[in-house]
Every structure is written in structure tokens, then in C-alpha cells.
């Protein structure tokens, strides 16, 4: 065939392909138009965290048997467990337990492998301070129950559920 005709056919095919790609992008843009906004006004509005959210660790002093499994499974050997061996009953007595949240990577291994379930993850994620030494929580600070976002009447909660397509 003539070279001019083949160039014209290639040009037509490329034009159709480009129009199809532009149309696909436009359809994706239009499909996002009916979704809820992601932006929230943070201090006054908060998202309700998911059930398996890994926030601050909660510690129950009475349940801990000082087995140090949490220290062994932690990738950075973070929890500090101080205990004393009671010779008359041959058991460990927990003296002090602390976690530095400035170093913690919130992997959840300590919670998952604890044999007595004395550790649990909370939905609390606001741990920012001006002094990094305030992020070192002892057993008293770890034992404090967090205030649920849903129970706080001063904050508007936003439930961000994925869309269910029917």
C-alpha cells in the first residue's frame, strides 16, 4: 500500500486508543464523585478506628506473671520487666513494667503472644508530647483506661465505612 495510507491508518488507530484511555480515566473520575470526603477537621472531628486498630498498649498489672514473653517476641526488646523471685513460693513477683512509646513500632507481637492476656491494644493514638521522656509509660500509665472516641461528647465522630456495591 501507499505509505501515506498506512500512516493515516496508524494515526486513526492511535487516536481511537487515546480517546479510549481518556474515556477510561474520565469514568474513574466520575465514579469517585459520589464517595464521601476523606478530609476531617481533626481536633473537632475524629474517625472511629477499626476493631483491630493498634493504638496505645493497655497493661493489667494483676494478670502479669513476669514471664517476659513480651520482651522475647518484641523485635526491639522494648518492654522493661523488673521482677523479684519469691523463694518461699518459688514464683516471680512483678515489681515494675514499662514501655517507651517513643521507640515502640506498634507491631502487636507482645499483645498476641502474652499467655495471660494482660496486654491489649487500645484505640488511643494521640501520644504526641513536647518531651520524648514523657512517652516512657510505667505500669500506672499503661493501666489507665483510654476514653473511647464514641463516648467523648465534645468530639463529632465520623464512621468511615467502605462502600458496598450492589
Curated annotation (Swiss-Prot):
One BP annotation, GO: photosynthesis, light reaction
Keyword list, A-Z: 4Fe-4S, Chloroplast, Iron, Iron-sulfur, Membrane, Metal-binding, NAD, NADP, Plastid, Plastoquinone, Quinone, Repeat, Thylakoid, Translocase
Membrane topology type: Peripheral membrane protein
Subcellular location(s) per record: Plastid, Chloroplast thylakoid membrane
GO cellular component, one term: chloroplast thylakoid membrane
EC number: 7.1.1.-
Binding site residues for [4Fe-4S] cluster 2: 74, 104, 107, 110
4Fe-4S ferredoxin-type domain: residues covered: 55-84, 95-124
Enzyme class: translocase
Major localization listed first in the record, in broad terms: plastid
Binding site for [4Fe-4S] cluster 1: 64, 67, 70, 114
Domain of life: Eukaryota
A single MF term (Gene Ontology): NADH dehydrogenase (ubiquinone) activity
Note describing how the cofactor binds: Binds 2 [4Fe-4S] clusters per subunit.
Catalytic activity: a plastoquinone + NADH + (n+1) H(+)(in) = a plastoquinol + NAD(+) + n H(+)(out); a plastoquinone + NADPH + (n+1) H(+)(in) = a plastoquinol + NADP(+) + n H(+)(out)
Co-factor(s): [4Fe-4S] cluster
Subunit: NDH is composed of at least 16 different subunits, 5 of which are encoded in the nucleus.
PANTHER family linked: NAD(P)H-QUINONE OXIDOREDUCTASE SUBUNIT I, CHLOROPLASTIC (PTHR47275:SF1)
Family statement: Belongs to the complex I 23 kDa subunit family.
Function: NDH shuttles electrons from NAD(P)H:plastoquinone, via FMN and iron-sulfur (Fe-S) centers, to quinones in the photosynthetic chain and possibly in a chloroplast respiratory chain. The immediate electron acceptor for the enzyme in this species is believed to be plastoquinone. Couples the redox reaction to proton translocation, and thus conserves the redox energy in a proton gradient.
UniProt name for this protein: NAD(P)H-quinone oxidoreductase subunit I, chloroplastic
